[in-house]
Amino acid sequence: MDFNMKKLASDAGIFFTRAVQFTEEKFGQAEKTELDAHFENLLARADSTKNWTEKILRQTEVLLQPNPSARVEEFLYEKLDRKVPSRVTNGELLAQYMADAASELGPTTPYGKTLIKVAEAEKQLGAAERDFIHTASISFLTPLRNFLEGDWKTISKERRLLQNRRLDLDACKARLKKAKAAEAKATTVPDFQETRPRNYILSASASALWNDEVDKAEQELRVAQTEFDRQAEVTRLLLEGISSTHVNHLRCLHEFVKSQTTYYAQCYRHMLDLQKQLGRFPGTFVGTTEPASPPLSSTSPTTAAATMPVVPSVASLAPPGEASLCLEEVAPPASGTRKARVLYDYEAADSSELALLADELITVYSLPGMDPDWLIGERGNKKGKVPVTYLELLS
């Protein structure tokens, strides 16, 4: 118990000495040991790394989870060391709504079939988003969080310890300076004509006491200087480790870009497949024209089928041979044609469509009754339907 009280009193004395030294430094009444320029640069770089890492971490969390309530919930689960429950993505929720709507409105109708197809694509988008969030959290967010909660806390602890060692060192310097000044004053030879013998003896005793005080202060200064140098070296090594942190974060950033590229490539592929599937749906993107034959009531079904003109928008309903024949018989409209540059490669879904290669030039035009998302494209002797989204129309 007595030992604990002595230690408590000693700690209180050290704390008071540091507080006095810190206050006098702030008011310019005490000298302060300055760190070298290289050390100051290391401190500034470490602080900058910590600040920007926090900002990047927070904004990446917002990117992956825009809902602030969900982010708070995930944060609480992590602090409680509990597994974060699986959360349905917005794409998966939209897919469920579309599937339910198709079931209620009629899955066999054109609208219902389209809802089902779009729901499948949205579900795939939601799954891709879930994989991206999981991959980005492991490969990018976790290393950043580990730096802030691990390495940076160690650096901060050692920096605080270095600050205390510096205050102790400067306090010892101030104490030694005062002791030397008092010793110099005490060792001044008194005037025997004005000084009584008794005062002379007291002056000699005081001089001896101040000599002991100077020796003690010098010993404390040497110990404080050694501890300060040792702590400065430890802190310097930790600060120089920030370079390794930058290398690690650079590798993690490459992983994040890779996962994000994979995610958007999957989304593009899913939507491209969806667009092709919707383009092949009969009755979904079908344009019609007025029949050139007599009314069906005055002709037989065979005669009506033979006399009905076939346009490219319904060529997919006919056999391949007939579809090709009909496309060859289609003539450009009187309003003229336009040139278009192909933006992306496109694989024809059937014989009524024209396969495209990126950056090639083709001639395009529209026919009455065609869906606005499609045009007729010509390249040499070949012609067929092409999606507008794959083209850049030239003036």
Curated annotation (Swiss-Prot):
Residue numbers spanned by region Membrane-binding amphipathic helix = 1-27
Transferase keyword on record? no
The BAR domain covers which part of the protein? 24-287
Q: Where is the SH3 domain?
A: 335-395
Q: Which GO terms describe its biological process?
A: membrane organization
InterPro entries referenced in this protein's UniProt entry, alphabetically: AH/BAR_dom_sf, BAR_dom, Endophilin_B2_SH3, Endophilin_SH3RF, SH3-like_dom_sf, SH3_domain
- Name any GO cellular component annotation: nucleoplasm
Keywords, alphabetical: Acetylation, Coiled coil, Cytoplasm, Phosphoprotein, SH3 domain
- What GO molecular functions are on record for this protein? cadherin binding; identical protein binding
Localization per record: Cytoplasm
In terms of CDD domains, this protein maps to: BAR_Endophilin_B2, SH3_Endophilin_B2
Q: Whom does it interact with, and what assembly results? A: Homodimer, and heterodimer with SH3GLB1.
* Protein family: Belongs to the endophilin family.
Name of the protein described by the UniProt record: Endophilin-B2
What species was this sequence derived from?
Homo sapiens
